């Protein structure tokens, strides 16, 4: 004879969920668990139970843990007991929970104790309550402000008007020192500044004419300013200190003017009248005779020819001016114009000077 299972009554069936092969059917009932959670939330006292939740947590986040009863039953055999409750990302709605009789609910104090034993602190996957302006972010921003990426530059160094003023001042001082733009470019390598080498003449020219880009002007200004200071200091000490460390161009000292005595000078003039353009052998023989250097004799003959040419040009200009501005002779006319051999308006010039008298 087969034993038939008793048919559950209507009251008992309404309180049960479909059979899920669990020995703890009353605990797996989502309606009972939701009702108990609602009552515990309504009756809880924050002052008496301060360690229950994080004060920054929202009320519906306290019941978002899906398996805080995992120590009571096997999770592989049981279903989720909070299928009827909203998740932490959705607002809590008390109307979802279906009310039951007071005989089926748990004691609020027992529910609170069970929650404290199951989870004393929020799990790591709980809602992140980090403040957007936390101390960590403030500290990191302070570190960034303390160590800037690029060193600050003064407004005076980047002002276009200041750059223009310095470029004009640099050009005037360079000309006064007698240094060319190419000499400045070569002298920059002697400044011993890191990353600074010689520059071309065109770069210095473009700096003085303000045709470089603004960034290149700003970068080149302190370099040229440093050279200008050292060049002026070297110019002041040039008479006392021979070595100027390549800041100024190494120019040779000016040669002394060669003076020829009067007797030798008279003999040279006689040789010049005889032959204004002597050959190299003739210059060498004259130098040996007068005990002078060959180069000195050659330069004297060259200078003498230039002097003769200047004198000839000045005489030619003087005679040309005298011919144009000379006296004008008016024609002598008789009473009868027909017997006059000169036509009216004809003029004669007497004593017209020649070009070479």
Swiss-Prot record:
Organism, as annotated: Caenorhabditis elegans
Knocked-out gene: effects: In a number of neuronal cell lineages, one of the two daughter cells of a division fails to assume its normal fate, retaining instead the fate of its parent cell.
Record's function text: Transcription factor required for correct cell fate determination and differentiation in diverse neuronal cell lineages where it plays a role in specifying the fate of daughter cells during cell divisions. Involved in sensory neuron production and function. Binds both alone and with mec-3 to the mec-3 promoter to initiate and maintain mec-3 expression which is required for sensory neuron differentiation. In addition, binds both alone and with mec-3 to the promoters of mec-4 and mec-7 which act to regulate sensory neuron function.
Protein name: Transcription factor unc-86
Key words, A-Z: DNA-binding, Homeobox, Neurogenesis, Nucleus, Olfaction, Sensory transduction, Transcription, Transcription regulation
Positions occupied by motif POU-IV box: 35-44
Segments forming domain POU-specific: 155-232
Domain of life from the UniProt record: Eukaryota
DNA-binding region, residue intervals: 253-312
Gene: unc-86
Swiss-Prot/TrEMBL GO biological process terms: mechanosensory behavior; neuron development; neuron fate specification; positive regulation of transcription by RNA polymerase II; regulation of transcription by RNA polymerase II; response to mechanical stimulus; sensory perception of smell
